[in-house]
């Protein structure tokens, strides 16, 4: 479908990441017009504003697109007859956010960031020769230069998980913010919409000085009480699984780290290191989505975080001269190739929590 807003292709834009709404139960569907499924999308990214050139857009918007797919009951017939339309709502500004920061971002990785440290290490004797880097990359890639502790990617303002609950649409996306008027950080823009009237019920932002919030996902019960899950990182906080309550009266409440979801080490994945991405540029991926699922009056949430530490000696194990154990390289695994504290090339985990708002 096309959106009635200008782009470098003319007077319309293509729909960009239309996210279908989920319902908390069988009694929460919209039965109007033969059954209606709602979607939400955003239009700050180049995919919407610059579909021809693919780049050069402003990367900011004050528009939210609400889509309606009507007569969905006809899908259960031999001749489906669907109708798709959209309307644009004016909202507060959102924009493509900066990358996340974590403790040590931009500095040389020490032994607590073992993969990055290995890529810079030219003195440790290994089974591949002098220099840990030889265990991971070739000479041409190593010549790309010294690595630093990465700044994980934020999302690009595309709409994240959407709910239809209590007669309303609930959605959120990543945005740039300046918490308390300070430096720009990654934060969350959230929206509660009445799709029948095409009006905003409530909207707002979630951000905090010294922190970045990314990849939100909202789950809302049939009664209209919900939880928004996301990853929280910061100047003094390793990537952690976090959440905040949400409802249509208050909006989003105070955020907290999920029980057991505190990150304990820096993101140390291969996509954030130029030697391992060589000859392509780095793209320090941090998942594409969080998740939330409603279970009666409770909400299950899932967000990425760094669950385990892995010291340099254990990371190298028998691949270092004089090392011990039989773990696979980079896994910090136990004996007999037992489960590791991380994978060979990345160290994120997913924290799943059950909350009752």
Task: Go through each PLM region and give its residues.
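C-terminal PAP-associated
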Residues: 1-357
């Amino acid at each position: 479908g096309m959106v009635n807003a200008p782009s470098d292709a003319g007077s319309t834009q293509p729909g960009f990441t239309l996210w279908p709404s989920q319902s908390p139960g069988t009694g929460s569907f919209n039965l109007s017009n033969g059954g209606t499924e709602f979607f939400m999308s955003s239009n700050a990214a180049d995919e919407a504003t610059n579909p021809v050139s693919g780049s050069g857009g402003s990367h900011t918007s004050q528009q939210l697109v609400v889509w309606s797919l009507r007569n969905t009951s006809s899908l259960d017939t031999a001749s489906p007859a669907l109708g798709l339309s959209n309307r644009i709502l004016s909202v507060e500004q959102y924009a493509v956010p900066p990358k996340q920061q974590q403790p040590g971002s931009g500095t040389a990785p020490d032994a607590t960031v073992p993969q990055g440290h290995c890529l810079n290490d030219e003195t440790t004797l290994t089974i591949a020769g002098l220099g840990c880097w030889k265990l991971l990359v070739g000479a041409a890639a190593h010549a790309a230069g010294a690595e630093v502790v990465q700044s994980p990617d934020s999302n690009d303002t595309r709409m994240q998980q959407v709910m239809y609950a209590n007669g309303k649409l609930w959605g959120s996306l990543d945005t740039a913010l300046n918490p308390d008027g300070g430096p720009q950080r990654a934060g969350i823009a959230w929206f509660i919409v009445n799709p029948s009237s095409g009006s905003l019920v409530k909207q707002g932002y979630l951000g905090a000085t010294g922190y970045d919030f990314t990849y939100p996902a909202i789950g809302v019960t049939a009664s209209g009480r919900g939880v928004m899950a996301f990853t929280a990182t910061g100047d003094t906080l390793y990537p952690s699984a976090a959440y905040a309550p949400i409802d249509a009266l208050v909006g989003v409440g105070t955020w907290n780290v999920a029980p057991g979801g505190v990150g304990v080490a820096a993101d140390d994945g291969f996509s954030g290191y130029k030697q391992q991405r060589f000859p392509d540029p780095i793209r320090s991926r941090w998942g594409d989505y969080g998740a939330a699922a409603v279970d009666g009056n409770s909400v299950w949430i899932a967000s990425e975080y760094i669950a385990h530490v892995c010291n340099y000696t254990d990371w190298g194990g028998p691949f270092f001269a004089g090392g011990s154990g039989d773990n696979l390289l980079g896994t910090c695994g136990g004996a007999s190739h037992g489960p590791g504290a991380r994978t060979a090339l990345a160290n994120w985990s997913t924290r799943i929590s059950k909350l009752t708002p």
